[in-house]
Amino acid sequence: MNREHISNEAVLLDVRRLTCAEGRGKGVDLFRVTNLAGLDFDILIDRAMGIGQLRVDGKLISYTSETGIVHPAYYEKDGFGWLRSFGGGFLATCGLQQVGEPCQGHGLHGRIDNIPAQEISWRRWWDGNLLWAEVSGVMYEACHQGEYLSLRRKIRLNHKEKRIWIEDVAENHGSIPSPFMLLYHINMGAPFLIPGTKVLLPESNIQTFDSAAANHAECSHLVPDVSDERLDLLWLHHPKQTSKQQTAIVDNGIQKVQITWSSDTLPILGQWELLQPRGYVLALEPTNTHLQGQAWENASGTLRYLMPDETYLTSLEFAF
């Protein structure tokens, strides 16, 4: 499209701020982002700047759970209460002090996904023949006389490509070292996810989370149909080749999702599949943890700490 043929740049790349009006999602602010290439997705301002529903060329890619969008005021922090506000979406963020199994003082997947962003802004600019937009915000996970962590997020795209770039910088603003755990919960569901969907991953050493995952290893490469066994499977992939980036592809034969992440700071890839009637989802999860919870990581000597004033940079790229 010739730039001289349009009166408003929103025709090419649009960012609109909206607010949910009813139910448990009432009051949640979001940015709805669309581009000429066919991307259409929501950035959930009040849920750690995660990505909610995501469509490509009008077709839904992301998973939508039973709860839908839930305001963080309803967050239940203990045990598995996180699941009561997990609406799915394309990207949920887990951490910053806890990822995985609940343990003393820490519920499933930590607090960050239920923390609203602040210092919010967006901008749009031309760089040559490309119109770019960037949305940014910062989440603070803090406690008086406790942790004082932030996660500063930038989400970027242009008008011509079906690509999204995310850059996060975590920082410890406190005066003592802080446990630091981070996971990106990238969720795909129907109608994109269908039986026979291929999952192409880096060559890895595979660690099974339990006997069910060990007994269904083939499901990690080819997603089956729902099962009366009500399978809930989790694998951890440790890429054999060390590099600054790794790439995974999910291909249903018609559409593809390509995920590239900074494997120097996210060295493990979790893979979760829920294969139950009316519960059908695939999640790929770049992380710096083993998904066993903070207590397990501490006992195993693998718990990562952020020193005072230390920063931790991670990046993701999604291509469709």
Task: Enumerate the predicted regions with their spans.
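Surface-exposed acidic/polar loop and edge beta-strand patches at domain peripheries
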Residues: 1-165, 176-179, 188-225, 237-320
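C-terminal beta-strand-rich structural cap/linker in extracellular carbohydrate-active enzymes
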Residues: 229-233
